[in-house]
Amino acid sequence: MPEQVIELTAVRRDYPAEPPVRALDDVSLGVARGDYLAIVGPSGSGKSTLLNVLGLLDRPTSGSYRLDGIETTALRDGARTRLRGDRIGFVFQSFHLLAHRSVVENVMLAEIYGGHPRKGRRERALTALDRVGLSHRVNFLPDRLSGGERQRAAMARALMGGPSLLLCDEPTGNLDSRNTGAVLDLFDELREQGLTIVVITHEREVSTRAGRRVKITDGVLVEEA
């Protein structure tokens, strides 16, 4: 597999307005396999737009985006959807767990909606839950979990398809300091296992744990020391 998971080259994203709004301005970024990258920046800086482009939820106006060596910008919607389901896992600030479903059922839903084969689905979900240290909560409903455990369940769901890239949008925004630390420890473990992680955050505790940090301001990306 290619050494670079993410290769952005001169990416722009413009939105129609008067005058036009440039949310991303000639953004170039390379993220190698196994990297742990934090993206920081003020509100309205372009962080969410960048996440949407990286997650194949939005198309750049111009420029190139290669994911795992695949040029994505010219792909049709169906091909982009399949590539996203195969290569990208998402973790958000809100856990998006169904209250009436058990933890393992919530994790299994990732493959149901992704069109993956039914055979072995529960076993794969149990493996993902064990990977995030939640094997003792598989039959619990979400309301019996702590905030940190709910985020771990959401991370297990994101890991179900064996993604190359984990995209995290403010993953600790709803957690206290203890649960934040536990989630960050899990990120460290996943990185050691070779997973590529990109985290958008405004929390310094989160960004300082990453191996790399970039800042986006007015759509312009700058690498930080």
Put a short name on every predicted segment.
Residues 1-3, 225:
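Short, low-complexity, intrinsically disordered N-terminal peptides in bacterial proteins
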Residues 213-225:
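H-loop (His-switch) and adjacent beta-strand-loop-beta switch element
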